[in-house]
C-alpha cells in the first residue's frame, strides 16, 4: 500500500522546488552538445505550444476557447520543464499533482502508473487557483521506461458549486465551490473510463462541456506524447532525460539573474478588494517585498 492517509497530503504540496538531480540525469547532461541542446529546447517549446493550441481548439468551455489554458512537459519526477500558457499563473498547475501521482500511485498495486493511463485533478489544495481549474496528465513511456509526463490544465467553468459558472462569489468554504478531485486515474490503455466520466458529469450543471474539455486535454496530451517519442527515437532516452533536467537548471539560473538585477530596497504595492468576505466593502492589502 502507498501509505496514503485518505486526507490531504501536506508534505507533497511543499515540494515546489525541483526534485534532486538523479545520477542518470547528471550523467546524461555531461554528454549533451550545447548546439544540440538548443535545438532540443526549441522542439520542447514547440511541442508545448502545439499542445496548448490543440487544447484551445478542441475544447468546449468559453475559458478554454479564449486561452485560459496551460500545457506542460514535466520530468518523470513531476517537475515542470517546459510550458505554453495563456495565463501565466496556470504554469505550475500540474507539478504538485504529478508529484502526488509519483509518490502515491506508482507503487500502489491497485492504481499504478502505466503506458496509456490518464490522471485527472482539480482540488486547489494541490493545483489551480480554484475548483474550476482542472487538469489532465498522461505518462510518456519509451520501451517500458517512464520518460516524462505531459498534460493540460484548463479553466472549465462549471464545477458544480453553489453558483453556476465556476466562480462562487458567495462561497464561505471550499466545499461550496463544487468538485474537489485529488489526482486520480480516469483512463487506462488510452481509453477514458466511462464510469468516472459519468460520475464527473453528474456533479456539474453542464456535463457535456465537462466531458468535451476532458477529451480535449487528452487529445492534446496524446499529440505531445507522439512528438516526444519522435524526439526520443532520434536523440535517445538518455539525451531526453538529461535535456529536460538542463532546461530546469538553465531556467533556475536565468530567474536568479533576473532577480539579481533588481535594485536593493523595499518595494511596496497596495491592492484593493471590493468585498469583505461575502459582503460589499473595501479591503486594502499592503504587500511589502524587501
Label every PLM stretch briefly.
Residues 1-42, 177-255:
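N-terminal leader/propeptide and maturation segments of large enzyme subunits in energy/redox metabolism
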Residues 76-83, 95-123:
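Regulatory sensory and allosteric helical modules in signal-transduction proteins
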Amino acid at each position: 500500500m502507498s501509505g496514503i492517509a485518505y486526507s490531504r497530503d501536506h508534505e507533497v504540496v511543499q515540494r515546489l522546488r525541483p526534485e534532486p538531480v538523479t545520477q542518470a540525469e547528471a550523467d546524461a547532461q555531461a554528454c549533451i552538445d550545447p548546439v544540440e541542446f538548443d535545438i532540443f529546447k526549441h522542439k520542447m517549446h514547440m511541442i508545448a505550444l502545439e499542445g496548448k493550441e490543440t487544447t484551445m481548439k478542441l475544447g468546449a468551455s468559453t475559458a478554454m476557447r479564449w486561452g485560459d489554458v496551460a500545457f506542460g512537459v514535466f520530468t518523470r519526477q513531476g517537475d515542470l520543464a517546459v510550458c505554453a500558457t495563456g495565463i501565466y499563473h496556470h504554469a505550475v498547475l500540474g507539478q504538485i499533482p504529478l508529484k502526488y501521482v509519483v509518490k502515491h500511485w506508482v507503487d500502489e498495486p491497485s492504481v499504478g502508473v502505466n503506458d496509456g493511463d490518464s490522471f485527472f485533478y482539480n482540488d486547489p489544495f494541490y493545483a489551480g487557483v480554484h475548483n474550476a481549474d482542472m487538469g489532465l496528465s498522461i505518462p510518456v513511456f519509451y520501451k517500458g521506461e517512464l520518460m516524462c509526463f505531459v498534460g493540460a490544465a484548463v479553466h472549465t467553468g462549471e464545477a458544480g458549486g453553489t453558483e453556476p459558472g465556476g466562480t462562487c462569489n458567495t462561497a464561505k468554504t471550499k466545499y461550496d465551490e463544487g468538485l474537489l478531485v485529488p489526482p486520480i486515474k480516469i483512463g487506462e490503455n488510452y481509453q477514458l473510463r466511462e464510469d468516472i466520466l459519468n460520475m464527473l458529469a453528474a456533479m456539474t450543471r453542464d456535463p457535456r462541456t465537462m466531458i468535451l474539455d476532458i477529451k480535449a486535454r487528452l487529445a492534446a496530451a496524446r499529440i505531445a506524447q507522439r512528438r516526444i517519442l519522435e524526439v526520443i527515437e532520434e536523440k535517445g532516452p538518455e539525451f531526453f532525460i538529461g535535456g529536460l533536467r538542463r532546461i530546469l537548471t538553465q531556467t533556475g539560473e536565468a530567474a536568479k539573474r533576473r532577480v539579481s538585477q533588481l535594485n536593493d530596497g523595499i518595494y511596496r504595492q497596495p491592492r484593493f478588494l471590493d468585498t469583505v468576505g461575502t459582503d460589499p466593502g473595501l479591503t486594502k492589502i499592503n504587500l511589502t517585498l524587501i
